Structures are given as structure tokens and as C-alpha cells.
């Protein structure tokens, strides 16, 4: 039987990220099409080579075709039929999808139905799925949802204290995101500790950021809510605020509610306080960004304390992942120091270079603390393989 390659696709409103794997789950190539609809930029990495070029992408369709042509042009594949499986990251599956799913007429219709819950994400994701269904007719397509891991959150944790019809008629509730990352971290540590199920507090800290309480291997609670805007202070997102601010600013500045929410998503967070959304720049200049760093660290620490309480103080590890959690040692140290009274201990000597994971807690620490490099693309590959194999059976 011919061994098929597996493509992982992450489509956004103005960008598409790709990773191509062989049947041994090894990365063959990484691609990026960004600034779609504007001026266009393309990047491809393979065999220790890197191609970067400006390309006009008028829509997602042209971006997909350019990437697939680049794979053939650079002899990464000979024919498109070599790609037998495509895993699509889909942000919003609501509480309907409790697992990854083979894309068919029904599942695609549901993804489109949930565009109203995540218009910036589900629409381009649905569009790109349809493009691949046409471009590579022989491939199976699997949708892997950010929200799936959080469908185990109990009702008392996902329900908002709002009128009942908001949930019943408009699907307003906590969904949570970064689920693929949390699933990867949980499974990685199950293997590392040779123990399952685990209790974990995982901080996924990147430009977007959230915290998740995992109880017995399942999501118990998470800081992001109905949208990724809730929770931690992020690169450009405000995180938790008083909701009455939205109508107040709309009235005061003669803006629509959508305009205000757009500013909370794209012009707030660390960007609003420091003028930069790049966490590396911010934490490299602590003397200039002192207030912003304190706000950021305090918010993460508050969620760690909250979730430790919800887990009755019984956890196998506190985990830091995502671009900031994996690499910004100064930031992680500050957060751990902020929760030292709860029994978490570290020191700067433990923050060296590492590959997949690194223990950063001291012997005196009540709890283990790890940094773990997440791999959402590999998790999507594994979910896609599992779902497509089950279909064959």
C-alpha cells in the first residue's frame, strides 16, 4: 500500500499556515501564506532550505494553489495525490463536536453554522476546507477543533450568570480554546510520567494566552470563554474587563459595539500598555514595561491560584508552554515567584536550554513545574490519523 503524506492546515482571516508530514509523522515542509487580500507574502521551509517571496494573494484559493504548486515545483511531492490526509485546525466546534471528525456534508455544514460564534476563524477555515476538497479529491479531510478538549468542562464552570435564553437560543457559554495544545501537553506528560490520568495546571502563553485546569486527564476549567477575548492579558487582547465598558466607550467615542470589541481584540492587552505586542521586546525591557509586566504576571498567577483551589491542591505538575511559556524565562520566573506562597519554587539556574521539556522546580517545591514545547500540528496529525483509520474500520 502506498504511504500517504499528511498535510496540516491552519487558516486564518488573512493567512494560512501549512505543515506537511510523512507517514512516520516527520515534518517534510512548512509553509506560510500571509497578508492575503493585501500585498501577499509566501514562505516555504524544507530540507534546511528557505524560500521567501512576495506574492499577490487576492483570496485564500490563490494562496492554497500557490502553496501546492510550490510543493511540486520544489519536488517535495510529485503529484497532489501523494497527500492522502489533510487535518484542518478549526477554532470553534461549540459543544457539538466532542472529537475530531471526518469532513463530510454534515460536518462542514455545522462548521459553517458556528461561523456566527467565531466569524474571524470559522469562515476562512470552512472556505479553505472547501478549497482542498476540490483541489485534492482523493484525500480525506479531518477537522480538529480547538474547543473539543474543553467539552468535558462541567456545567457550573461553563455556564455564565446571564438570562437562560442566551445559552438556549444563542449558544452563549464558555467554550475555551487552545484545546489541541492542552491535549498534546496532557498526553506528552502521561508518557513522560508513565502515569494516567493526570491533574495539571497548564499555562499556554503566547500572543494569545490561556490557562487550563486538567482533572483526571480532562478539562475542568479554562480562562478563555465564549471567545478567546476572555481571561489573561494577551498581546493585543484585553482579557477580563467589566463588560459595561463596551457600551460606555461606544457611547462616549461614538463607536459601534463591534468597533469597541475590535479594539479590545486588536488594540488592547500588552500593546495598549506598552505600544508593543511582542512579548520578547516587552520582557527584554522590564525597567520600561514594569507596570505591564506586573499586570500580566498578576493575571496569570491569579488563574493558577484559582485552578489549584478547584483541583483541591492536588496536581501532578504546573506547566508552561506556548512561545512565551517555553522561551521567556524571566516571565515564567516572575509568575512562579508570584505563586510561591502556594508551594511553587524555582530558581534561575534551572532555566537552561532544553529540547522537548524541562523540569524547572527545585527540590523544595511542593509541586513539579515543567516547561514543555507544545506541538499542535503533531497532535492534529495524530487526531486525523485516528479518525480516518476508524472510518476505514
Swiss-Prot record:
Binding site for ATP: 17, 204-208, 278-280, 323-327
Family: Belongs to the acetokinase family.
Subunit structure of this chain's protein: Homodimer.
Class of this enzyme: transferase
Main localization (coarse): cytoplasm
Reactions the enzyme catalyzes: acetate + ATP = acetyl phosphate + ADP
One term under GO cellular component: cytoplasm
Protein localization: Cytoplasm
Keywords for the protein's UniProt record, in alphabetical order: ATP-binding, Cytoplasm, Kinase, Magnesium, Metal-binding, Nucleotide-binding, Transferase
Name of protein: Acetate kinase
Source organism of this protein record: Mycoplasma genitalium (strain ATCC 33530 / DSM 19775 / NCTC 10195 / G37) (Mycoplasmoides genitalium)
GO BP annotation list: acetate metabolic process; acetyl-CoA biosynthetic process
Domain of life: Bacteria
Cofactor note: Mg(2+). Can also accept Mn(2+).
Record-listed E.C. numbers: 2.7.2.1
Lineage, highest ranks first: Bacteria, Bacillati, Mycoplasmatota, Mycoplasmoidales, Mycoplasmoidaceae
Record Pfam families: Acetate_kinase
Pathways involved: Metabolic intermediate biosynthesis; acetyl-CoA biosynthesis; acetyl-CoA from acetate: step 1/2
GO terms, molecular function: acetate kinase activity; ATP binding; magnesium ion binding
Binding-site residues for substrate, renumbered to this chain: 89
Function: Catalyzes the formation of acetyl phosphate from acetate and ATP. Can also catalyze the reverse reaction.
Cofactor entry: Mg(2+); Mn(2+)
Amino acid at each position: 500500500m502506498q504511504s500517504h503524506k499528511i498535510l496540516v492546515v491552519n487558516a486564518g482571516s488573512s493567512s494560512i499556515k501549512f505543515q506537511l508530514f510523512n507517514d512516520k509523522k516527520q515534518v517534510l515542509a512548512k509553509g506560510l501564506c500571509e497578508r492575503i487580500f493585501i500585498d501577499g507574502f509566501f514562505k516555504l521551509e524544507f530540507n534546511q532550505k528557505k524560500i521567501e517571496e512576495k506574492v499577490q494573494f487576492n483570496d485564500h484559493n490563490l494562496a492554497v494553489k500557490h502553496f501546492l504548486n510550490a510543493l511540486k515545483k520544489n519536488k517535495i511531492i510529485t503529484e497532489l495525490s501523494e497527500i492522502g490526509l489533510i487535518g484542518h485546525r478549526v477554532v470553534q466546534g461549540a459543544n457539538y463536536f466532542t472529537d475530531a471528525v471526518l469532513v463530510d456534508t454534515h460536518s462542514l455544514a455545522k462548521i459553517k453554522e458556528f461561523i456566527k460564534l467565531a466569524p474571524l476563524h470559522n469562515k476562512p477555515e470552512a472556505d479553505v476546507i472547501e478549497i482542498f476538497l476540490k483541489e485534492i479529491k482523493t484525500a480525506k479531510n479531518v477537522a480538529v477543533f480547538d474547543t473539543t478538549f474543553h467539552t468535558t468542562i462541567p456545567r457550573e464552570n461553563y455556564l455564565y450568570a446571564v438570562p437562560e435564553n442566551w445559552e438556549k437560543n444563542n449558544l452563549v457559554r464558555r467554550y475555551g480554546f487552545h484545546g489541541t495544545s492542552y491535549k498534546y501537553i496532557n498526553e506528552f506528560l502521561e508518557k513522560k510520567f508513565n502515569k494516567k490520568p493526570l491533574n495539571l495546571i497548564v499555562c499556554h502563553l503566547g500572543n494569545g494566552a490561556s490557562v487550563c485546569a486538567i482533572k483526571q486527564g480532562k478539562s475542568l476549567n479554562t480562562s478563555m470563554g465564549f471567545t478567546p477575548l476572555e481571561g489573561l492579558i494577551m498581546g493585543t487582547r484585553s482579557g477580563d474587563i467589566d463588560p459595561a465598558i463596551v457600551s460606555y466607550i461606544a457611547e462616549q467615542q461614538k463607536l459601534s459595539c463591534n468597533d469597541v470589541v475590535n479594539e479590545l481584540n486588536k488594540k488592547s492587552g500588552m500593546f495598549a500598555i506598552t505600544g508593543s505586542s511582542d512579548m520578547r521586546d516587552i520582557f527584554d525591557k522590564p525597567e520600561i514595561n514594569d507596570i505591564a509586566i506586573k499586570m500580566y504576571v498578576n493575571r496569570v498567577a491569579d488563574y493558577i491560584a484559582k485552578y489549584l483551589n478547584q483541583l483541591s491542591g492536588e496536581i501532578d505538575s504546573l506547566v508552561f508552554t506556548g512561545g512565551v511559556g517555553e522561551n521567556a524565562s524571566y516571565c515564567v520566573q516572575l509568575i512562579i515567584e508570584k505563586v510561591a506562597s502556594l508551594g511553587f519554587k524555582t530558581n534561575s539556574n534551572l532555566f537552561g536550554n532544553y529540547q522537548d521539556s524541562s523540569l524547572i522546580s527545585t527540590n523544595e517545591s511542593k509541586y513539579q513545574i515543567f516547561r514543555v514545547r507544545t506541538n499542535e500540528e503533531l497532535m492534529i496529525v495524530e487526531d486525523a490519523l485516528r479518525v480516518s483509520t476508524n472510518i476505514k474500520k
